[in-house]
Amino acid sequence: ADRGPSAPLVIVFHGYGSEKSQMLPEARALLGLGLSVLLVDFRGSGGSSGDYTTIGVREADDVAAAVSTAKACLPHAKLVLYGQSMGAAAILRAVHERQVAPDAVILEAAFDSLLATVRNRFAAMHVPAFPSAELLVFWGGWQYGFNGFAHNPAEYATSLKCPALFLHGRGDRRVSVAE
């Protein structure tokens, strides 16, 4: 929803296993604050083409494409990127690798590295993480053409040059506060 050329635009990116309609409560809250909102489905999610995700690696290209389109349509609008989990990782990677330069970011339940988050998922299921987590990260990266061990949103965050709001809760069963 466009609230006019002077309203900041918030581009909202969903998490893994989700799609943009699940971000409607957040979008409604942002609209209630007078902001313009654009909801995006990552490749392989919701109404987008593709049949797999890369937990933020290739999705960073989707972030960059959404930002490019938004800047072309609303060149004077302040730009805020909001991402949940994988969406937060994709935003951080886009800033780091694609030189995306938002005016601010909101990062909810961001994980620090792909390997750490996979290990934590195994632990949450009460399954030994080693060597399964390492094999999963290796295999997933190999299968989809990237180095999963190098996917480190915490490292990408060092490239942020804008205000950042990190949201996280102790009750999150998927991403630990330590991450």
Task: Locate each region found by the language model.
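Alpha/beta-hydrolase active-site loop
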Residues: 22, 53-74
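Short beta-strand/loop motif that positions the catalytic acidic residue
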Residues: 159-161, 166-168, 172
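The serine-hydrolase catalytic nucleophile loop
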Residues: 16-29
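Conserved alpha/beta-hydrolase
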Residues: 27-49
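Conserved alpha/beta-hydrolase "acid-adjacent" motif
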Residues: 173-179
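Hydrolase active-site cap/lid region
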Residues: 93-149, 155-156, 162
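Short beta-strand element of the alpha/beta-hydrolase
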Residues: 7-15
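Alpha/beta-hydrolase fold nucleophile elbow
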Residues: 74-85
